[in-house]
């Protein structure tokens, strides 16, 4: 458990973060309750995710690396009511259950419009080659709620050249974000790191990197930057219902 203090002239805040390490043979996953982050991921002894760290971006210091969930939306909100990628990555999650190779987290937010929503995150290492992330949106209210989530993994990539579903890309030229559709299965290769990614309800990938570290992102989303456009019916979770989003990363080589 880590304790962080934020000092200000008017107040002092203490944030307690719990870090958990999941294991399955040579696979390890470090999970952080602050933001529901995966701070690091190693499959079969290979570093799959660039470890979460602080990097300098211009005059700012920003978190990069690992993987976080984007909820209730991936990307910006045109009405500016919600922060970039929503509030999941800046919230403190509660542990629901924990075993050697899996963990369940829960978040109940006071964000306007989402007061009756319970967000469930499940991370697991089913074997030493695979990692699974599942987001379940539970709407216990009467009214439908709008969601268009995603996962934001930073894959380890020393070079800029990579391959996505057989098409070549250069990370130096995707800082604007390239959106690519890929139903269910995607095949990605970074510097010899070959991955299969299988998803559920996340058919649009955001390919992005700012190259402020040795990482490139291939992010499965529901509809990309959906909150920049008018709402559509498929983005809503009805009252007293649930919707599930999932991704499985499998190390191929």
Task: Give the role of each language-model region.
Residues 16-27, 32-34, 104-110, 186-253:
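Beta-strand-rich recognition/accessory modules
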Residues 28-81:
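Acidic-aromatic substrate-binding/catalytic surfaces of carbohydrate-active enzymes
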Residues 31, 123, 131-139:
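Short, well-ordered beta-strand segments enriched in hydrophobic/aromatic residues
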Residues 82-127:
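Extended, loop-rich substrate-binding clefts of extracytoplasmic carbohydrate-active enzymes
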Residues 119, 131-133, 243:
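Hydrophobic core residues within well-ordered beta-strands of beta-rich domains
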Residues 138-143, 252:
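Short solvent-exposed strand-capping/beta-turn motif centered on an Asx-Ser/Thr pair
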Residues 143-205, 210:
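Active-site/ligand-binding surface loops and adjacent short beta/alpha elements
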């Amino acid at each position: 458990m880590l304790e962080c203090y934020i000092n200000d002239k008017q107040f002092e805040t203490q944030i307690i973060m719990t870090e958990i390490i999941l294991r399955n043979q040579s696979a390890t996953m470090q999970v952080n309750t602050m933001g529901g982050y995966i701070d690091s991921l190693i499959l079969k002894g290979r570093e799959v995710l660039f470890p979460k760290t602080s990097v300098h971006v211009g005059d700012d210091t920003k978190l990069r690396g690992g993987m976080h969930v984007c909820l209730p939306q991936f990307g910006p909100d045109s009405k500016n009511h919600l922060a970039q990628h929503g509030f999941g990555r800046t919230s403190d999650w509660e542990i629901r259950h924990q075993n050697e190779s899996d963990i369940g987290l829960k978040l109940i937010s006071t964000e306007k419009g989402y007061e009756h929503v319970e967000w469930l995150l499940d991370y697991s290492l089913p074997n030493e080659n695979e990692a699974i992330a599942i987001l379940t949106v539970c709407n216990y209210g009467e009214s439908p709620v709008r969601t268009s989530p995603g996962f934001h993994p930073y894959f380890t990539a020393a070079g800029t050249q990579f391959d996505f579903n057989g098409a070549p890309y250069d990370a130096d030229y995707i800082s604007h974000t390239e959106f690519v559709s890929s139903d269910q299965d995607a095949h990605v290769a970074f510097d010899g790191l070959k991955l299969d990614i299988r998803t559920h309800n996340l058919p649009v990938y955001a390919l992005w990197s700012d190259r402020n570290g040795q990482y490139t992102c291939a992010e499965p989303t529901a509809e990309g930057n959906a909150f920049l456009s008018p709402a559509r019916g498929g983005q809503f979770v009805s009252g007293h219902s649930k919707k599930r989003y999932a991704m499985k990363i499998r190390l191929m080589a």
